[in-house]
A protein has these predicted regions:
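Extracytoplasmic
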Residues: 1-15, 36
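Conserved MFS/SLC helix-loop-helix module at the cytosolic interface between two early adjacent transmembrane helices
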Residues: 31-70
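Cytoplasmic helix-loop-helix junction between adjacent transmembrane helices
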Residues: 75-114
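Helix-loop-helix hairpin linking two adjacent transmembrane segments in secondary transporters
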Residues: 110, 114-158
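Flexible cytoplasmic inter-helical loops of multi-pass small-molecule transporters
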Residues: 154-174
């Protein structure tokens, strides 16, 4: 994170503390991704993706309120990592549904946009952080994510029902 030097200085964090935050994030993310996939197969992927974006965006905004190591662990690792973990499986499943013969190309466009977003947001977060402080970068990016989540709630569509819902519907109609 490009605002990490500002956070480290403001909160007096050591390299070990910063590394611990990243480790706990990856631990929670890795534990929750399979659960996100399981849930994504059974419920509306539109709402899983939307709720994930909203949850992790709100957690991002709350990161700006952190005043120490423990709060950063909770907000960045548990809340943000937890939100992101449910996004991926449902998101990639939706992309696959919408692009049958062009699935690989669609995934490549998604990944390209993802990395372009990382590049642009890195610059923008550094700029905002330098002008108004590291907390402002989290408020701004969290707010942008909330707007994105609201747009997704309105515009995103589930192309087909998750397997468990479809199976339950078929069983009821017999």
């Amino acid at each position: 994170n490009v605002v990490l030097p500002l956070i480290r200085e403001d909160l007096g964090l050591s390299d070990v503390a910063v590394g611990t935050i990243a480790t706990v994030f990856n631990l929670f993310y890795a534990m929750l991704v399979p659960i996100g996939g399981f849930i994504g197969d059974r419920f509306s992927r539109k709402w899983i993706v939307t709720a994930s974006v909203l949850f992790w965006s709100i957690a991002t905004m709350f990161t700006g309120l952190c005043n120490g190591f423990l709060m950063l662990v909770v907000m960045r690792s548990i809340a943000t990592g937890g939100g992101e973990a449910f996004f991926g499986p449902a998101n990639y499943s939706l992309i696959a549904d919408y692009h049958d013969r062009t699935r690989a190309f669609a995934m490549s466009i998604h990944q390209t946009a993802y990395y372009i977003g990382i590049i642009i947001s890195g610059y923008a977060a550094g700029y905002v952080g330098q002008l108004w402080g590291w907390r402002s970068a989290f408020y701004v990016f969290g707010a942008v994510g909330v707007v994105h989540g609201v747009i997704m709630a309105v515009r995103l569509k589930d192309k087909k029902e998750p397997a468990a819902v479809a199976a339950a519907s078929a069983a009821e109609s017999k």
